[in-house]
Structure formats: C-alpha cells, structure tokens
From Swiss-Prot:
The gene is NifU. Belongs to the NifU family. This is NifU-like scaffold protein. One of its GO terms (biological process) is iron-sulfur cluster assembly. Keywords: 4Fe-4S, Apicoplast, Iron, Iron-sulfur, Metal-binding, Plastid. One of its GO terms (cellular component) is mitochondrion. It comes from Plasmodium falciparum (isolate 3D7). Its main location: plastid. Binds and transfers [4Fe-4S] iron-sulfur clusters to target proteins. GO terms for molecular function: 4 iron, 4 sulfur cluster binding; iron ion binding. Pfam families: NifU. It is found in: Plastid, Apicoplast.
Length: 247
C-alpha cells in the first residue's frame, strides 16, 4: 500500500515540474521574440531617423562634389551664334569679363590697337612677370576673344599678345634677359645684328652676335649648348622665328 502511495506522489511531482518548466520556456521564448522584433534595425523607428539623416547628409555631400564649377562666360550667347562686332568698344566688353580674375593676382590686360583683322592686346602687372602664368593667361585671352568677336566677314580675329607674340627687338631682348646671369658669368653679351619681321609671319629671321664684355674686338667661341639654349628660348616665344648666329 505504501509503495502505491509513493508511486502516485512521484508521478504527480514529475507532472508538476514538467508543466512549470514548459511555461517558463514559453515565456523566455516570447521575451526573446519581443526583444528581437523591437530592436530589428529595419523595423525600429528610433533607428530610422538617424539613418535618414545620414542619407540626407550623404546626398548633400554628393551634390557638392557634383556641383558645376564657376564659369565666367555664358555659353548660351555663343551657342546661338551671337557675336560682337570687331571694334574697340566690344573688345573692351569682352576684356571686362576677364579682368576681375586677372586683378585678383595684381594683373590686367589692355587693348593696344586694331588693324584690319589683327587685334593687339598687352598684358600688364603680374601677368607679365610670371612666365608660366603668362602663357596660360595669353591662351585664355585669345580663346575668349575669338569666341565672342567677329569681323565683317564673320571671321575670328587674329589676336596678338604684344608682350610675347609680336616679333620686335624689345621682346627678343626681354626673352634673352632671362639668360643674363649665365651670360654675365661667361662675360659675354648678345646683340641683334639683323631682324626681319614679316606681317604674314613668314620667313621671320633674327641674327645674333656675341660680344666680349671686357674687349668687344676680341673674338670669342661660344659653346653649342649656349646657342641651343638661346634658340630654344626664342622659339618658345616666337615659333615662326628663325635664329642664326654671326659668330
């Protein structure tokens, strides 16, 4: 009898423990699901706000990177074929578009003269003293004037930068002055013996002569590398110029 009673108690105890553990397990599982559902990044409204802000900020940065750079000229004028007539007033209008950029670096540009289809322009200030910058500025000025100016035959003007493009003794001497320290070391100077300059830029010719600073009557021998350097400097400034040496 006692054995039967103990067996019944054992069965009831086992059943009670099993039911209790099952309820606890279901509660923990529900709690885990609650945590998972409420902290899912894609379903959490609290996390969506900062993500949206980040996306907007990223979009703004991308827009800044893809922004159109500052442009001086309006392309619509040229695209429609609207040009200014070749005269001093219209040339000044176009140059006024360029001047603000040049004046930032203490430079400027001025109209010298207009002869037929030749447009003579002079660089001023730092536009001349900085050789590397002057080449870029000259190119921009030429391109801009040719873009907006036309003569009576609807032709582009022949833009001549007098500081560099015009072949004359002063510009040649200015180019040679860049080599003056080296020539002074050799105790020689370079003079222009003959200069032929055609308006058509055909057969332009210059003949140079070396003189001894201490004794001009004394003959001197100049190394070929010095002559080559002088020739290259002049050809860079005046591509149509032929350079020869008397001695």
């Amino acid at each position: 009898m006692n054995c039967i009673f103990l067996s019944v108690l054992f069965i009831w105890y086992f059943f009670f423990v099993y039911v209790k553990n099952l309820s606890i397990l279901q509660y923990d599982k529900a709690k885990v699901l609650f945590i998972q559902n409420n902290f899912e990044p894609l379903n959490n409204n609290m996390l969506r706000v900062p993500l949206n802000i980040l996306r907007k900020r990223t979009y703004v940065v991308k827009n800044k990177k893809n922004g159109v750079p500052f442009q001086i000229f309006l392309s619509s004028e040229n695209d429609e074929g609207l040009y200014y007539e070749l005269n001093p007033e219209n040339v000044e209008k176009v140059l006024n578009l360029i001047r603000p950029k040049l004046q930032i670096d203490n430079g400027d540009v001025e109209l010298v003269d207009i002869k037929n289809n030749d447009l003579y322009i002079r660089l001023l200030g730092n536009c001349v003293t900085c050789s590397s910058n002057s080449i870029t500025v000259s190119h921009v000025i030429k391109k801009t004037l040719k873009m907006y100016i036309r003569n009576e035959q609807n032709q582009e003007p022949n833009v001549i930068i007098t500081n560099f493009d015009e072949i004359n003794e002063q510009n040649i001497q200015n180019c040679l002055s860049q080599l003056k320290p080296y020539l002074d070391f050799l105790k020689v100077e370079v003079i222009i013996k003959e200069l032929v300059n055609n308006k058509e830029n055909i057969n332009n010719y210059v003949c140079l002569k070396f003189l001894n600073i201490e004794n001009s009557s004394e003959e001197i021998n100049i190394p070929h590398n010095v002559k080559n350097e002088i020739t290259e400097r002049l050809k860079q400034k005046f591509p149509t110029l032929t350079v020869n040496f008397e001695n």
